[in-house]
A protein has these predicted regions:
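Extracytosolic ligand-binding ectodomains
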Residues: 1-274
């Protein structure tokens, strides 16, 4: 910002990043406020189909900026949407034990658990829950560790049934054919690993920057900033389900859209929107 160099961010999701008045920061991905809204839309729609079965929530988050912002956003949304938060637990990001946290959640047994955890702590939570015989009725995660490329292989049956928000899944290739083409290119350089959430978002951010540079016809930072402020990319050129890429005055993409996917038989399956 001080140097006047545009920064196109494809992956970071803290809502605060586009509330600080930056003029050179452009975020392509949905932020956690938008992802949290998606989670509550899912719960509301689930309740319509299941006689209001979901009433109580548990919020579990690591205590760095991302986890704290996510937990705070979810807590505010719960109050707004009239859900009762029976536990809101923050834990140290590099903790080696979650025994007491899991015991508290088990005692309250919320209808939905909303965790915001990085990879090692997501593994730790599921292993601890298994050890202490706690099985959340419904777990809807804020991405991160729950979409790590090694998550399913590492956790095996413990991952089954986990739901997580995401802006990408390879099964969307049925409606977004470009995913198949890009995934084939990606696998050539990844040792055969499929494209996943974070690389897909990074790719989308990079391509938005590339298009802005083409529009600017220059690598001059001010010209690129102006191009980014005016860019309007349609969904037909994207590998994510966004409606496009167009930045608001705060630098946030105004055409984002996310999905929820669930681990079923060792694979991520898109389950929402229904």
């Amino acid at each position: 910002e001080r140097a006047g160099i545009p920064w196109v961010n494809g992956e970071s999701t803290s809502p605060k990043l586009t509330k600080r008045g930056f003029k050179y920061f452009f975020r392509v991905t949905p932020h956690d406020g938008e992802f949290t809204q998606l989670m509550f839309e899912f719960m509301n729609d689930f309740n319509k189909k299941n006689d209001g079965a979901l009433k109580t929530l548990g919020i579990l988050h690591e205590d760095t900026l991302w986890g704290s912002d996510s937990g705070s956003t979810q807590n505010k949304m719960a109050k707004k949407q009239k859900y009762k938060v029976v536990e809101k637990i923050a834990y140290k990001a590099k903790t080696t034990t979650l025994d007491s946290e899991v015991q508290r959640l088990k005692a309250k047994n919320p209808d939905v658990l909303l965790p915001s955890s990085y990879t090692s702590d997501a593994y730790l939570f599921l292993n601890t829950a298994s050890k202490l015989n706690y099985s959340p009725k419904l777990l809807v995660a804020q991405n991160a560790g729950y979409t790590d490329p090694k998550f399913i292989a590492t956790m095996g049956s413990k991952a089954e049934g986990v739901i997580t928000r995401s802006p990408f899944n390879t099964d969307l290739a049925k409606t977004i054919p470009l995913i198949g083409d890009i995934n084939r290119l990606f696998k050539k350089h990844s040792g055969g690993r499929d494209l996943s959430d974070v690389p897909a978002r990074a790719f989308t951010g990079f391509m938005a920057l590339a298009q802005a540079i083409n529009v600017a016809g220059s690598t001059d930072p001010k010209a690129i900033q102006t191009a980014l402020q005016n860019i309007d990319i349609g969904p037909e050129t994207l590998i994510v389900p966004y409606r496009g890429v167009k930045f608001g005055k705060d630098g946030q993409n105004t055409k984002t859209r996310g999905i929820l996917m669930q681990v079923q038989n060792g694979k991520y399956c898109t389950v929402y929107p229904f």
